[in-house]
């Protein structure tokens, strides 16, 4: 079998970027690798290396990127591709992740979050491409990761019956509360996947990354992902302002949107509890454990909504809090 280094060199040899200087970029929780290629004139592009043999597929990224760009949004332009072997050359949108810009210039925080909220308003008014639904059953099963991975990692034993009961009840809640016309949800819309592009105008000032897992879902999902960030504390005032800003700009039913926001908060944050536990236990990435207390706080806050009453006590009783002792049990 030809190794990936050889495959990559063959891919680059068929592009104008073959002789450009290469440097590794920080990766993410996936199996993808990224490099920045720098030309003799200082121009740069980004190489994505997504091994198909590790379950990666660049085709959804290409399809969604092209769609987002047709809507006037700043997804990277695809400069060259080899979908069979999992290589892409992308427009380089720079290094100014929202998280870095806010750390450097805290006064910009509200402006950046408002711009990211406006992206969602614009996207949710656009005609939607064909996407698989992010429906109640799938969402309930993904939430179950908190029981199968987070709970089991701490307690040392699983309870399939408990998980099955929860998923059945939660599916009913999702079906009753997460309703309406679906929109494209990127599913990982947060400050480390957004880039600030101040030289552009309007919604194009927000560079978009990591949208390849997009599905058809509820408009509240990406807004909640943005404002209940697993990696940084978003001020409560900004969260409340952006929810109100979205509701007013999108001209939608406020009560139903806020209910869906809370239910989806529990859904997503339960999934993240399980994913972070799995990344530590199964993949030797213990740094994700340090993020769990923040995710737990989002989850517990969401449980206070009356719509979650059918599962709230079950979850409070069965999911152990992330005490220092419990977190240590999740580390390899």
Name each region found by the language model.
Residues 274-332:
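ATP/Mg2+ or Mg2+-diphosphate-binding catalytic cores
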Residues 31-38, 47, 171-221, 233:
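Active-site acidic catalytic loop and adjacent metal/ATP-binding pocket
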